Amino acid sequence: MIKIATEKERAGVYKTMGYCFNWSEDAIKNNIESGSFNKYEEFIVSLNDKEDVESVFAIIPYDVYFEGKIVKFGGIGGVSSLPENRGAGNIRKMFKFSFEYMKEHNMIFSGLGPFAFQYYRKFGYEWCFTWQLVNIPINDLKDFPAASSYRQLKKEDKELFENFRNHINERVNGPVVRDERLANEKWDYYRNTNHKVYGAFNDKNELVSMMAFKQEGKEIKVAEMYFEDELSRQNLLYFFYRERSLTEKVELVLHVDDEIRNILPSPRISYWHWPNKMGRVVLVEEALKLLNIKNSFDNFSIKINDDLAPWNNQTFNVSCVNDKVDVSCDNSLADFEMDINRFSQLIYGHIDASQAIKLNFVKINNKTRIRDFEKLFYKKTTMLWQEF
């Protein structure tokens, strides 16, 4: 039986998760009931004939930015199954159930942090989020301009910090909007782990960039960094140079398309790209209507293959006039066909139409509509760094 866990079934939830994550049941219980998940999630469970929990995962609701708009998102966490019940298809059935739940709650997107990308592809998820990790020698930062002033930000500055963070993140597809609960949790974490939070201000005393960082030995590790423009980013980089007596290098986590190496004295620094999280579209029609389109185009059609969310498993006719996307559905032969995995990558902007065609992710039935297809799906910055 697949269902939403009751309070009575929580003990079975903790037992199953504790086994899979190698934690005690009490540790799992304390982590969930004292942390940000408490009262903010549903656990989807599979029960055996004795009504014992054999498989479980959580749906954690978030608001996220997509195309500059705030939409609902279902985060998947704690996927667990006891070994005696694996291979029976329970997790697949649970995902199907969860997509019905998300549809009822208007969660347009979903995402997760995979232990194996190939496993979660079976449920329609695909690689949509990557971060870039760079290590910069401290002396490479000496020639950047200083801000008019710098100020350490405290928890009482939380509203200033979060408003600026939202202002920057609304330009990106995927970041979580931190509500009061999540913001308090993050600030408490910074306080408890000796992170410092600083802002850079211009000559009008306006916040133009900010970051949270921690000194570890001779290295500064930056947890978050937000900046209005290139100048304000360089103001932060110079701030780190002021720490040169204690620091040999700075580690930054950046968007994968960030071009920071172009502004450094030498691009030969240590850097790497890490495939981070997977994303999935739960409601295709609603997601298409959210897109911001640069150029109008005539109607063309896309067939989506999605056997776990049958409302997506159809042909969508798409057109754009005056920057507004119009969508209708039918079962005619489509100009393009693809699975929900690759559609999810395309609509987030992790890949563009040309890449999808080149990599044979799309079946093309009408080559005359490729130009319009490329107008709909183009490259964008994606980001999902929230842990869940």
Model-predicted regions and their roles:
Residues 1-61, 68-75, 142-182, 216-221:
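Short amphipathic alpha-helix that is part of the acyltransferase structural core
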Residues 127-143:
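Flexible glycine-/small-residue-enriched beta->alpha junction loops
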Residues 95, 99-114, 245-256:
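Conserved GNAT acetyl-CoA-binding A-motif
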Residues 11, 151-388:
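Intrinsically disordered, low-complexity, positively biased terminal segments
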Residues 104-108, 114-132, 257-273:
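Conserved active-site alpha-helix within GNAT-family acetyltransferase domains
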Residues 76-81, 86-100, 230-241:
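Conserved acetyl-CoA-binding loop-helix of GNAT-fold acetyltransferases
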